[in-house]
């Protein structure tokens, strides 16, 4: 990919997702005319954040760095409160902007703070992990975690732009790319089978940030999400399909107190959801089995603790898709044919969980735990 690719998200407030390399100039252009900018970044990205701050300062923009805790530790009310205090000190107004620089947790937190500061200020996301590029940064979902569950406090607040700089993937550990691949695989199953074919053809190429396959996977994933979000921004109907595999996945994350990467938990959730669809008579055997095969090809886990089922069912009760206390799952009626399964019999859940249950310590699928 030599020239940047632009994917337009056609919501009521359209915005571009720009995919390319060396996009600092694009960020500066997006912020031209802004007086004050707050750059939210995670600790490993301090040097990059300083480069962004300096580039903005050269254009006369008063830019400030706000370092936030890494991963899910940053999605906390106390951290959000600290960020609000900083925004107050630097005098950030409605005509100013927030920039997120980091993984999915950084985009979630920065988006939430931007949504709530003065009832909404502009935010631009610069995702630096695969998961954030293909999922968290696009679509306007923001949120923080509480003891009650993951992302239960949040808002819909669309970014004014998303800048996906592919060069950043060359600096992250391989297990970050592996973890993000869960969302890519999910997208393939719900909407774009070409994604699955590309991974099956050459799994190593799919994980190579210097090659041509991974950028295509990112582009395809972003295009799918852009179409879904444009049709259903606030997750009233269609957008729920993006949560395929997430019902069990979020419950695993909560049980592990977020020590598992999001992608690892979603991978197990995808195998569970596929089995649920199979047992409900809605998904064919070949497509159900293909889930485990592809996820294992890229090094993701497909099993979890056999003794955890009771706790996971309890955790799934807080899922945002539920209605009137009834569990609701996204399942497949075939490849790229997502649907819903409401109130499945408990015996069906038990049988589906047997497909991922593993005695003793769950497999990590290649160091995808934090």
UniProtKB/Swiss-Prot annotation:
Cofactor(s) needed? Co(2+); Zn(2+); NAD(+)
Keyword set includes Phosphoprotein = no
SUPFAM superfamilies, A to Z: Dehydroquinate synthase-like
User: Is Isomerase there in the keyword field?
Assistant: no
> Quick one: a GO biological-process term for this protein?
chorismate biosynthetic process
Q: What is its EC number?
A: 4.2.3.4
Q: Which reaction does it catalyse?
A: 7-phospho-2-dehydro-3-deoxy-D-arabino-heptonate = 3-dehydroquinate + phosphate
User: What is the UniProt remark on how the cofactor binds and its stoichiometry?
Assistant: Binds 1 divalent metal cation per subunit. Can use either Co(2+) or Zn(2+).
Q: Which residues bind Zn(2+)?
A: 183, 246, 262
Top-level taxon of the source organism: Bacteria
Q: Which Gene3D superfamilies match?
A: 3.40.50.1970, Dehydroquinate synthase-like - alpha domain
Pathway annotation: Metabolic intermediate biosynthesis; chorismate biosynthesis; chorismate from D-erythrose 4-phosphate and phosphoenolpyruvate: step 2/7
Pfam families of this UniProt entry? Answer: DHQ_synthase, DHQS_C
Q: Name one GO cellular component term.
A: cytoplasm
Q: List the disulfide bonds.
A: none
Q: Which compartments is it annotated to reside in?
A: Cytoplasm
Keywords in UniProt for this one? Amino-acid biosynthesis, Aromatic amino acid biosynthesis, Cobalt, Cytoplasm, Lyase, Metal-binding, NAD, Nucleotide-binding, Zinc
Enumerate the HAMAP family for this protein: DHQ_synthase
Task: Give the similarity note.
Answer: Belongs to the sugar phosphate cyclases superfamily. Dehydroquinate synthase family.
Q: What does this protein do?
A: Catalyzes the conversion of 3-deoxy-D-arabino-heptulosonate 7-phosphate (DAHP) to dehydroquinate (DHQ).
What is this protein's name? 3-dehydroquinate synthase
């Amino acid at each position: 990919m030599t020239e940047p690719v632009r994917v337009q998200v056609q919501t009521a407030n359209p915005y571009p997702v720009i995919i390319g390399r060396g996009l600092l100039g694009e960020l500066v252009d997006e912020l031209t005319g802004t007086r004050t900018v707050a750059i939210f970044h995670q600790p490993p990205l301090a040097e990059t954040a300083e480069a962004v701050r300096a580039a903005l300062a050269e254009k006369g923009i008063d830019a400030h760095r706000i370092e936030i805790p890494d991963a899910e530790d940053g999605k906390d009310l106390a951290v959000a409160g600290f960020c609000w205090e900083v925004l107050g000190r630097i005098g950030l107004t409605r005509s100013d902007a927030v920039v997120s620089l980091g993984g999915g947790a950084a985009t979630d937190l920065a988006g939430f703070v931007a949504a709530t500061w003065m009832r909404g200020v502009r935010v631009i996301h610069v995702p630096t992990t695969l998961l954030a590029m293909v999922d968290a940064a696009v679509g306007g979902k923001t949120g923080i975690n509480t003891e009650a569950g993951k992302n239960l406090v949040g808002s819909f607040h669309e970014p004014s732009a998303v800048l996906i700089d592919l060069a950043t993937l060359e600096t992250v550990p391989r297990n970050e790319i592996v973890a993000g691949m869960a969302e890519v695989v999910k997208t393939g199953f719900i909407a774009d089978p070409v994604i699955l074919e590309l991974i099956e053809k050459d799994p190593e190429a799919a994980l190579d940030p210097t090659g041509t396959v991974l950028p295509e996977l990112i582009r395809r994933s972003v295009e799918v999400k852009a179409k879904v979000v444009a049709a259903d921004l606030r997750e009233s109907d269609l957008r729920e399909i993006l949560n395929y595999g997430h019902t069990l996945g979020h419950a695993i994350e909560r049980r592990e107190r977020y020590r598992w990467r999001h992608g690892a938990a979603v991978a197990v959730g995808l195998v569970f959801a596929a089995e649920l669809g199979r047992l409900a008579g809605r998904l064919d055997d070949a497509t159900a089995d293909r889930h485990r095969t592809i996820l294992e090809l890229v090094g993701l886990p497909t099993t979890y603790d056999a003794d955890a089922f009771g706790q996971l069912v309890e955790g799934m009760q807080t899922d945002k898709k539920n209605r009137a206390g009834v569990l609701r799952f996204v399942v497949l009626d075939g490849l790229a044919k997502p649907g819903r399964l409401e109130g499945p019999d408990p015996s069906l859940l038990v049988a589906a969980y047997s497909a991922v249950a593993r005695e003793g310590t769950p497999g990590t699928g290649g160091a995808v735990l934090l």
